[in-house]
Amino acid sequence: MAALSSATKRLGRLIPHSSVLFVCDVQEVFRGLTFQLPTVIHGTNTMVSAAKLLNVPVVVTTQYGSRLGSTVSEISKNLEDAPDVKVFDKMKFSMLVPEVERHLTTNMPQRKSVLLCGIETHVCVLQTCLDLLDKGYDVHVVSDAVSSSTSYNRSMALERIRQSGAYITSVESAIFQLANDAGNPEFKSISKLIKEHLKVQNGFDTGARI
């Protein structure tokens, strides 16, 4: 069993019962200030929907919410019926503040794979990733659900994250990894979710800024 667990970690497998979804600081104030934010919101929302289908808990943070506002309405609305979601406000850039770490260790100690979405890739997402890696978590950064103020900062940060040992994935790939099998009871719903997701253009596939 120990050998299997080690191999699973090395390969970066995503399994619902050992995973948690992190949504980092996708706040109203960043509309118009973040490269391809509509794509980030859409991708993050698809991840939230998949988490609800597959019983993956969600951890959401806001950065200095009293000044910078709440999570964008599209995501907040989708989270309303999530069975396991906790929202934390913070001042530190990393999501792994003591309250979040306590929530993880107390309520979900078996969940050691973190799917990470949000902004900004070169600041809060990067620092969250490094802190999680330092604590022994596998980190899967969902590349079409993270961004920065500029395309350059996003690209640089993804490379830095890769250098540190995290996995870079996509919305579609991560969800199919979690589902794992066309025999999954939720596969029809997952397939429909992916089809709906792909109807919206991925802004990171183009040079246009939205």
Swiss-Prot record:
Top-rank EC class of the record's enzyme: hydrolase
SUPFAM superfamilies in the cross-refs = Isochorismatase-like hydrolases
Phenotype when changing residue 90 to A: Impairs the isochorismatase activity and reduces the virulence
The UniProt entry lists the main location of this chain as secreted
Cellular location(s): Secreted; Host cytoplasm; Host nucleus
Per the UniProt entry, the effect of residue 25 to A is: Impairs the isochorismatase activity and reduces the virulence
Task: Tell me which GO cellular component terms the UniProt record holds.
Answer: extracellular region; host cell cytoplasm; host cell nucleus
Mention one GO molecular function.
isochorismatase activity
Q: Give the signal peptide, or none.
A: none
What UniProt keywords are attached to this protein's entry?
A: Host cytoplasm, Host nucleus, Hydrolase, Secreted, Virulence
Which Pfam families does the UniProt entry name for this protein? Isochorismatase
Query: Which reaction does this enzyme catalyse, per its entry?
Result: isochorismate + H2O = (2S,3S)-2,3-dihydroxy-2,3-dihydrobenzoate + pyruvate
Does the record bear Hydrolase in its keywords? Answer: yes
> Does the entry annotate any disulfide bonds, and if so which pairs?
none
Active-site residues per Swiss-Prot or TrEMBL entry: 25, 90, 124
Highest taxon of the lineage: Eukaryota
The record's note on what follows loss of this gene reads: Leads to a significant reduction in virulence on soybean seedling and increases the concentrations of both free salicylate and its glucoside (SAG) by about 3-fold in soybean seedling.
Q: What induces it?
A: Expression is up-regulated during the infection stages.
Question: Can you tell me which family this protein belongs to?
Answer: Belongs to the isochorismatase family.
What is the stated purpose of this protein?
A: Secreted isochorismatase required for full virulence of P.sojae. Suppresses salicylate-mediated innate immunity of the host by disrupting the plant salicylate metabolism pathway via hydrolysis of its isochorismate precursor.
Name of this protein? Secreted isochorismatase effector Isc1
User: What is the species listed in this Swiss-Prot or TrEMBL entry?
Assistant: Phytophthora sojae (strain P6497) (Soybean stem and root rot agent)
Lineage from the top down? Eukaryota, Sar, Stramenopiles, Oomycota, Peronosporales
Gene responsible for this protein: Isc1
